Amino acid sequence: MAAKEVKFGNDARAKMLRGVNVLADAVKVTLGPKGRNVVLDKSFGAPTITKDGVSVAREIELEDKFENMGTQMVKEVASKANDAAGDGTTTATVLAQSIITEGLKAVAAGMNPMDLKRGIDKAVIAAVEELRKLSVPCSDSKAIAQVGTISANSDLTVGKLIAEAMGKVGKEGVITVEEGTGLQDELDVVEGMQFDRGYLSPYFINKPESGAVELENPFILLADKKISNIRELLPILEAVAKAGKSLLIIAEDVEGEALATLIVNTMRGIVKVAAVKAPGFGDRRKAMLQDIATLTGGTVISEEIGLELEKTILDDLGQAKRVVINKDTTIIIDGIGNEINIKGRIAQIHQQIEEATSDYVKEKLQERVAKLADGVAVIKVGAATEVELKEKKGRVEDALHATRAAVEEGVVAGGGVALIRVAGKISNLTGDNEDQNVGIKVALRAMESPLRQIVINAGEEASVIANNVKACEGSYGYNAYTEEYGDMISMGILDPTKVTRSALQYAASVAGLMITTECMITDLPKGETPDLNNSGGMGGGMGGGMGGMGGMM
C-alpha cells in the first residue's frame, strides 16, 4: 500500500479553500449579462470558448492534491446543479464559495462546525420554502422566451426560437439542438411519431420526385416477429384489399418470399403496401411497438401473448391519417389512438423515467414520451466559424434546459433578486444555539453573492447596488445589462425557480461537508518520503560531526 500524506485542522482547511477559490474564481467570471468568456485548451483542434459554468469547472485539475480535493468537491456542486436543472451551475458555484469561505472563518474563530452546518441547513430549508411562495407559473410563450433569452446570455433570437419550438411540440415534446450549416438559426419541426427505420425496398416508393413512400389513411400491422412466409400475411392482405385501403407493415423484419410478394402486389397495384423494420432492439423494440400500437389504436401481434398473424383481423390493425417513409425514417401522422390510452402510456413512461438511474435510459424514455405527445423540434444553430458555433450551441442547450425548468416549477425575479428577497424574509430565523445562528448568517450572506458577482462582472460597485436592492421590495432589482433599476419581471429578467432552488441546495450540501472537514488524506507523491520527527536530529548530528572533524585538523 502506498504511503499517505495527512493534514489536520486549519492546515487542511486552508489548502482545501485555495482549491475552492481557484475553481470558483475561474467559473464566476461568466455570471450575468456582462460575464466574460473562458477559453479552454483542447489537446486537438481549436480551443473551446464558453460561458457555461460546468464546462469550465470540468476542465480544472490542480497539481497539489489537497487543493485539488477542494476543487473536485465544488466541481460536484456545479455538476449536480447541471444534472438537476440543466442550468444555474455558475450561481451554485458562487453560493458554495461564499458559504465555504465564511463558514471556514467561523470555524477558525472557534465555532462548532457541526452546529454551523445545522444552521446553514436550517436557513436553506426555510429559503426554499420562501422561494416556492415567490414562484409564479411560466406558461405563456412570452415568459418562456424571456427565460430562454436570459439563459442564452441575453440573446433574444434564441429565446424566441425556443418559445416557438415549445409552442409547436408542446411542453412534453422533444426539442433537440444541432449544429446548422448556415449563418442563421433555424427551427425544424417533425409532427407525429418519427423513428429511424426506412423502407425495406425502394420498390415501395410511390413518390419518385421525393424518393418517399406516402400512404393516405393506411391500416398499420404491428408484428413482433420476422415475417418470411407469405401465407401468414394472405388473410390480412385480402381483407385490406377488400377495404380499398393501403397497408403499412412494421415488423422485426420482412424478408424472402413475403417481401417479394408484397413488392409484386404493390407494383401491380393490387394493394398498396410498404414494410419497415420495427425501431429499437430487444425489450426496447417491444416497448416502442407498443407505443406505436397505443398511438394508432392497434394491437401488437405477438406469439408471446398468443396472437398469430394468420388469424389477424382488421380490428387488430392500427390506423393513421398519413404515413411518410424515406430511406432512413418513418413518420406516422395523426394516429387514431384513444387519447386516454395515450395519456396513460405517457404516465407509465414517466414512472420509468423517475426509476431510471442511467442518463442514457432517461434520454431514450424522454424521446418516447415526446413521440407519443406532440412530435420533435430541431433547433439548428448557425454561426460564422466552428468555434463560435460550438459556443453558441452550448448557450442554446443551457437556455433550453432553463426553459424546461421554468415550465416545471415556475419562475422568480432574476438577477439574484429572488435570493435577496428570500434572505430578507427569513432574516429573523434563529437556531438552537449561538453557533447555529452564525451558520444561518453565513447562509444569508451567501444569498447576496450571486447579485454581487453579477454587478462586479458588469464593472459596478457591488455593495452600493446590493444595499439599494435590499432597501426595496418585491421583484425590484438591478438590470446589469441596461445599468438601471426596475421591476425585474416587467423587464423580462426571470430565473427558473428550479434552477435557483437547486443551486442553493447543492451549494449548501457540499459546503456543509467541507466546513465539517477536520482531516484530509492523500497519496504521497512518488519519490517523496514523509517528514520524520527525528529528521532534524539527524541533520544536527551530522553537522556536529563535521565540526569535530574540522577541530581535529
Swiss-Prot record:
Question: HAMAP family attached here?
Answer: CH60
- Briefly, what is this protein's role? Together with its co-chaperonin GroES, plays an essential role in assisting protein folding. The GroEL-GroES system forms a nano-cage that allows encapsulation of the non-native substrate proteins and provides a physical environment optimized to promote and accelerate protein folding.
Cite the source lineage: Bacteria, Pseudomonadati, Pseudomonadota, Gammaproteobacteria, Enterobacterales
GO cellular component terms, semicolon-separated? cytoplasm
Q: What residues does ATP bind to?
A: 30-33, 51, 87-91, 415, 495
Q: What is its EC number?
A: 5.6.1.7
GO BP, one annotated term: protein refolding
What is this protein called in UniProt?
Chaperonin GroEL
The chemistry this enzyme catalyses reads: ATP + H2O + a folded polypeptide = ADP + phosphate + an unfolded polypeptide
Give the top-level enzyme category: isomerase
Q: What is the native source organism of this protein? A: Buchnera aphidicola subsp. Tuberolachnus salignus
* Keyword list, A-Z: ATP-binding, Chaperone, Cytoplasm, Isomerase, Nucleotide-binding
Which molecular function term from Gene Ontology is one that the record holds? ATP binding
- Please name the SUPFAM superfamilies in this protein's record: GroEL apical domain-like, GroEL equatorial domain-like, GroEL-intermediate domain like
Quaternary structure note: Forms a cylinder of 14 subunits composed of two heptameric rings stacked back-to-back. Interacts with the co-chaperonin GroES.
